[in-house]
Structures are given as C-alpha cells and as structure tokens.
Amino acid sequence: MPIKSDRWIRRMALEHGMIEPFVDHQVRRGVISYGLTSYGYDMRVTDHFKVFTNVYNALVDPKQFDPRSFVDIRADYVDIPPNSFALAQSLEYFRIPRTVSCIVIGKSSYARCGIIINVTPLEPEWEGHVTIEISNTTPLPARIYAHEGIGQVLFLESDEPCEVSYADKKGKYQGQTGIVLPRIDP
C-alpha cells in the first residue's frame, strides 16, 4: 500500500475534486503550515470549534452523547482549557477514491506544544469535511488558530479496489458537513 506523492495528490485534486478548496503548494510564512506537501496534504481548520465543558456534569457516553457537553465558538482562534479537548472541522472537503485510505497525523508545531490531533481513517469512497479532535495535554490553556494547518493527510493506495467501500455500506458520517458529534446506527 504505497504512499501517494504530491504529483498524484495534485492531479486527483484538480481533475477529480478530491480536495476542495485545494492549495497546490505549502504555505508556511507566519502560519501553521498548510497545503500540498511532498507526500501528503496539510489540511486547515475552520473558525468553528466545539470546546468540551463539564457544566452539566454529564457522563461522556458515545452511545448517548449530550451535545450540551460543548460550547460553540466561532473565532480566529480558540483557547482549549488545560487537560481538555475541542472538536473542529476541516476547511477542506475530501472525496476519497475507492482504492485509497487516508490517515491523518498531527502537525509538529502543535505536537511540540502538547497539542494532539486525532482523526479516524478516511475510508475508501468516504467524502465530507473531517471532524477533528484536538486534545490539550498540558496544564495550561492551548491556542489553536483558525484557517491554518491542523493535520497532515497521508494517502495510501491499495493494489486493488476494496470489496465494500464506505459509500457502499452507507457509512453514518458520509457527506458530513459541520462538526459532527458521535452517532450510533439504530
């Protein structure tokens, strides 16, 4: 399952709409970098964040998640409380080809500050805005900047198409826009 290069990513983004909007180079000056890299794509985060709070003393249960556990914030940056987390959304909309699976890893600028990014794999034929979990592992507030890089998407291509894609199984997060909270199929 080889990793795909900048040439392949550019071609798929421009000819097949795999990444929209697409930045065909890496933007680095004065920002957390974003755009096309040698073997990946640094996606950005929007200005919409859901910051975890324990105002209602709710239990965190993925099967019965209480949306009141979050405070909605729209801003150029967000400060995540110590030892807490926020959810955010990628600026880019992704359309993953049937023979490709993607993993997302955090940006070193954030990781070196104790900020960890978690995203589950982008499966074959999944499409949507990525919901991103951002953890502040430090005992201090941690700042995240909107419209700047948040994680690098690596594209891994199989030597054959999968038998059942995310679209085929009608995955519950297919076509998601906005920040999507946990869902359980009925």
From Swiss-Prot:
The keyword Nucleotide-binding applies. HAMAP family: dCTP_deaminase. DCTP binds at K107, S108, S109, Y110, A111, R112, Q152, Y166, Q176. One of its GO terms (biological process) is nucleobase-containing small molecule interconversion. It comes from Chloroflexus aurantiacus (strain ATCC 29366 / DSM 635 / J-10-fl). The active site is at E133. InterPro entries: dCTP_deaminase, dUTPase-like_sf, dUTPase_trimeric. The keyword Cytoplasm does not apply. Pathway: Pyrimidine metabolism; dUMP biosynthesis; dUMP from dCTP (dUTP route): step 1/2. It comes from the Bacteria. It catalyses: dCTP + H2O + H(+) = dUTP + NH4(+). This is dCTP deaminase. Catalyzes the deamination of dCTP to dUTP. Homotrimer. SUPFAM superfamilies: dUTPase-like (SSF51283). Keywords: Hydrolase, Nucleotide metabolism, Nucleotide-binding. Its EC number is 3.5.4.13. One of its GO terms (molecular function) is dCTP deaminase activity. Belongs to the dCTP deaminase family.
